[in-house]
């Protein structure tokens, strides 16, 4: 199984040179694939520089603003248009997964209807550009969200589009907090377009590097593969000091977990 890693392991990009430096570290650590995280913008101006590093882009993480579920149509449309611009900005990497958070986490069902309207607009753009909208499974955070949309709800939402351009991103670090991950894989059978792989201790979305928590990641990967996933082990973890040696160790540990998958 190929290993990919998200640039979300690095801090927000405050300088245009940072992303290139981050990617050079990732390449030096032995990774060949990345997901470009939502902390990075103005990608279209740096396509050639990114290509010169010799790293391939597996996925793009979108950054759909919260107003995408607003009842104020002007605000909602502004949020959607902002995301459409990001899709255009990263279009050189299509076809690939384009990750979007599932925002229907409030009790009032009207928010869900607004979210669907926004996704319908993004779906049209995804078909135009060749992206696969990959709707991410949500974390269980009752301290933050009014309700928990489980993997069945999210996979049913995805299936309702009946489109190859809408799929699920199974975030095992999110779903592990409330659901059995083998059941999550089964719920998402046939519509898994991307995965986010990190570890936790079962209480919070710690985003630990694979192997540093309590999740049976190899077993989950096997289940995801059996349920139709064909992409890389896409690591999306956090680290306070992601030096090249640290990144290399994350790669080595993840390769051991994925051996012969």
Where are these regions (language model features)?
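Histidine-acidic metal/acid-base catalytic patches
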Residues: 1-27, 89-96, 118-121, 129, ...
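Active-site-proximal loop/turn and secondary-structure-junction residues that shape catalytic pockets
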Residues: 9-11, 38-42, 63-66, 102-106, ...
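Conserved glycine-rich "GG(E/T)P / GGGxP" loop and the immediately following alpha-helix
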Residues: 11-17, 69-77, 143-148
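Structural motif corresponding to the early beta-alpha repeats
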Residues: 32, 37-114, 230-232, 237-240
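A structural signal for short, well-ordered beta-strand segments and their strand-loop junctions
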Residues: 35, 99, 133-135, 169
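A short acidic, helix-capping loop that chelates divalent metal ions and anchors anionic groups
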Residues: 66-72, 106-110, 141-145, 203-208, ...
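Conserved anion-binding
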Residues: 101, 118-120, 132-141, 153
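Active-site cleft segment of glycoside hydrolase catalytic domains centered on the general acid/base Glu
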Residues: 108-122, 126, 145
